[in-house]
Swiss-Prot record:
InterPro entries for the chain: Ferrochelatase, Ferrochelatase_C, Ferrochelatase_N
Full protein name: Ferrochelatase
Organism: Pseudomonas fluorescens (strain Pf0-1)
Gene coding for it: hemH
Any one Pfam family match given in the protein's UniProt record, by short name: Ferrochelatase
Involved pathway(s): Porphyrin-containing compound metabolism; protoheme biosynthesis; protoheme from protoporphyrin-IX: step 1/1
Keyword Lyase in record: yes
Amino acid sequence: MTDHALLLVNLGSPASTSVADVRRYLNQFLMDPYVIDLPWPVRRLLVSLILIKRPEQSAHAYASIWWDEGSPLVVLSRRLQQQMKAQWTHGPVELAMRYGEPSIETNLLKLVAAGHKRITLAPLYPQFADSTTTTVIEEAKRVVREKKLDVQLSVLQPFYDQPEYLDALVASARPHLQQDYDHLLLSFHGLPERHLTKLDPTGNHCFKNEDCCKNASAAVLATCYRAQCLRTAALFAERMGLPDGKWSVSFQSRLGRAKWIEPYTEARLDELAKSGVKKILVMCPAFVADCIETLEEIGDRGKEQFREAGGEELVLVPCLNDDPQWAKALATLCERAPLAL
């Protein structure tokens, strides 16, 4: 029996659309120091304030996009897991969520108990960020350390510029981009600017000029989420043969009053509508599975906002989800994952 297991990890979801389940999920998510990178007392106070109203608001949003089978993110991730079982021939393929269930700890313990001493951990995030990639890796390391697991852990690296990922993205999006449209907006998840500046290895590059991300050195690019997003967008546009002016980049899901990376998706939708754009396509390449940020934030609220600003039609291009070419690409990428523990 082969013993090289694969553990796919996505963000997670509330167990249901009930306010109690959403509150529990948001508390776990927002109390992660890699998500809100403030000292514990400040973070606890801030999250407590957020949890006064946000759970009810978010529960309503989740209910508007919830499927009969459950959370779209979890359902689509499980479908990808099934696709991966045919692509990953070295051992079992399990699925974990960083927040909620099934947890990273539960799955690591399950795999080790079954005799698998080599596991590839696959954070399903194309671009690197502490709040996504790092927190998954650190949680896995915590489990290995605290449970004293005898296991070799390899970790899938960010794949924002890898040909396999880009080719799958192009193949998935092409049918949608063959229709008539005025503009393509590539909307990535946003982050507070401080999440980027604190990782700048030079200490004097991030946000020092408008083209800092375009001119990032290899050392800066390795940990700069915004630069990686722009690189993904540019490589995608190049592969699709999109002319300048036909596409642009924005960042969504801003939370709180801190300065986040720009341009903001909400502002960009208004600008495009008021500039005469009538039909817009929106892709969300930071997500490999459709979720509340794509289906509700863009597909529902973004569509309404665009129309109110003067646009006529917003079409959300689906994420990679369980696309067979994406599953094949992911298996290839995981084959190259370097040893971490």
